[in-house]
């Protein structure tokens, strides 16, 4: 893989900048936008970026940091899904707490924002409290977003309970956008000043990157990733007016800045040190880019990937038509098309060939996989196994120089697994999933040296690109994710079945 980003340089620059910012205050509330852990978007668009860079940065500062996690009650009620992991936001909070503790970072508490006694939210609160985790409930702020006098009063932020913290840097994070991070920071700021403490607010958001051009593919890829939020990158006019320098920010931050500035000034009783939304940020990711061409190409590929993802989400009913069309429009505005993703054409061509041969109207599932050396392999679904499993077996055979004629998994192993699945567990689908086939391969590896050699090649699939001609099940997507394979799908179901497609 060609590297476009220097991870070590970035870590050094970023930690230094955060410490400089905290020196101005007794306590700094640092709003962490984007993903704190497993930032797969950043990893894809910035080749060389460590997906866990942010948490490693916090680990470096662990003596000075504690963490508050925000979760919007409405996201619990509607079971909002974190797309890259296929888990709900409330489950992601539990995962996040475990991961933070694994890095020796102190989790102060969980804040439920815009709470109004929702039933599913109450169950989640009970679950946390019975495991010894502090939970605070913040209701919707009265007067927000325009009535600053009410917002900054005992009727506004004052109604929220004060979260007791002990360290100079308080990181406020969440599973995703719209979780109430900013409101939590400002509520805390209000309480700190009422107690006579000098506290500050800053924002750490990786995208958009303020010091690369507005129409750079890296920033356009961010628009594509947040297409459901309708985020649009813009020139920060406040920054230009104050410093005569061009900086990029996004519409929500720019639109909310005048009110945010007034709120901070009313809380502190002083003129804000921030002249622009860009001033509020501490992001130094742009300084880690070492090869702009590599980053541009990776970002273009991400835009195509996002268009596929949004098309599938539209088909599943998760997003509206406007979001679907916007993702497609962003791709077309960059003069990109679906076929610019190398694995798309081989998958579609093979599927068309199989469809013609079988003389069926239903789409055949074919998965194409591009290996690190540029080789593209395909696998198709059969009565025995899914296309995902077939292409993985073909890939490990390729890496291990095993002939295509050799069977890695003995029928003696496969038959009882299929019998268990269909006859005992009552599954409607006889075909084994990718995970089931990998388990079967591992069993064979115990007695078959060839299977063992193939098994050892699985880590080589990390970072590979794949495309499926039909929508994959959540289970198949998660297996590919665990293997480190980025997969896209055509927005087509494998059959007309409604439940058994999954």
Curated annotation (Swiss-Prot):
It comes from the Bacteria. This is UPF0371 protein CLB_0371. Belongs to the UPF0371 family. It comes from Clostridium botulinum (strain ATCC 19397 / Type A). HAMAP family: UPF0371. InterPro entries: DUF1846, DUF1846_C, DUF1846_N.
């Amino acid at each position: 893989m060609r590297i476009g980003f220097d991870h070590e340089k970035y870590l050094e620059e970023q930690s230094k900048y955060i410490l400089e910012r905290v020196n101005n205050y007794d306590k700094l509330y640092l709003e962490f936008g984007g993903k704190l852990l497993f930032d797969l978007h950043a990893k894809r668009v910035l080749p060389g970026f460590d997906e866990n860079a942010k948490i490693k940065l916090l680990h470096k500062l662990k003596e000075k940091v504690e963490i508050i996690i925000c979760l919007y009650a409405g996201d619990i009620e509607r079971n909002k899904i974190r797309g890259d992991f296929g888990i709900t936001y409330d489950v992601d909070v539990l995962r996040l707490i475990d991961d933070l503790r694994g890095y020796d970072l102190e989790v102060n508490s969980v804040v439920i924002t815009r709470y109004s006694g929702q039933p599913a939210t109450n169950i989640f609160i009970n679950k946390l409290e019975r495991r010894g985790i502090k939970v605070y409930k913040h209701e919707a702020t009265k007067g927000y977003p325009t009535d600053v006098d009410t917002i900054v009063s005992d009727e506004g932020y004052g109604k929220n309970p004060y979260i007791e913290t002990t360290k100079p840097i308080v990181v406020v994070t969440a599973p995703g956008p719209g979780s109430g991070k900013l409101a939590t920071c400002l509520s805390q700021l209000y309480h700190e000043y009422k107690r006579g403490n000098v506290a500050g607010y800053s924002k750490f958001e990786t995208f958009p990157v303020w010091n690369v051009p507005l129409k750079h593919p890296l920033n356009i890829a961010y628009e594509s990733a947040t297409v459901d939020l309708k985020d649009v990158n813009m020139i920060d006019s406040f920054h230009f007016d104050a410093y005569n320098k061009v900086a990029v920010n996004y519409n929500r931050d720019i639109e909310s800045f005048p009110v945010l500035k007034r709120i901070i000034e009313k809380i502190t009783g002083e003129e804000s040190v921030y002249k622009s939304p860009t001033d509020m940020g501490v992001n130094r990711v742009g300084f880690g880019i070492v090869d702009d061409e590599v980053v541009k190409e990776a970002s273009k590929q991400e835009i195509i990937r996002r268009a596929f993802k949004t098309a599938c989400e539209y088909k599943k009913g998760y997003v509206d038509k406007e979001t679907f069309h916007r993702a497609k429009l962003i791709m077309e505005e960059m003069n990109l098309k679906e076929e610019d993703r190398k694995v798309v054409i081989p998958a579609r061509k093979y599927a068309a060939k199989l469809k013609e041969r079988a003389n069926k109207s239903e789409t055949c599932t074919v998965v194409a996989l591009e290996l690190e050396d540029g080789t593209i392999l395909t696998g198709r679904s059969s009565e025995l196994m899914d296309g995902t499993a077939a292409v993985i077996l073909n890939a490990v055979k390729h890496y291990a120089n095993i002939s295509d004629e050799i069977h890695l998994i003995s029928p003696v192993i496969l038959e009882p697994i299929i019998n268990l699945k269909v006859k005992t567990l009552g599954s409607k689908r006889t075909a084994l999933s990718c995970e089931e086939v990998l388990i079967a391969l591992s069993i064979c590896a115990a007695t078959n040296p060839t299977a063992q050699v193939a098994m050892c090649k699985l880590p080589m699939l990390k970072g590979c690109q794949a495309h499926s001609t039909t929508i994959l099940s959540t289970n198949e997507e998660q297996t590919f994710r665990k293997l480190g394979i980025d997969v896209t799908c055509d927005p087509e179901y494998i059959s007309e079945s409604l439940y058994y497609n999954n």
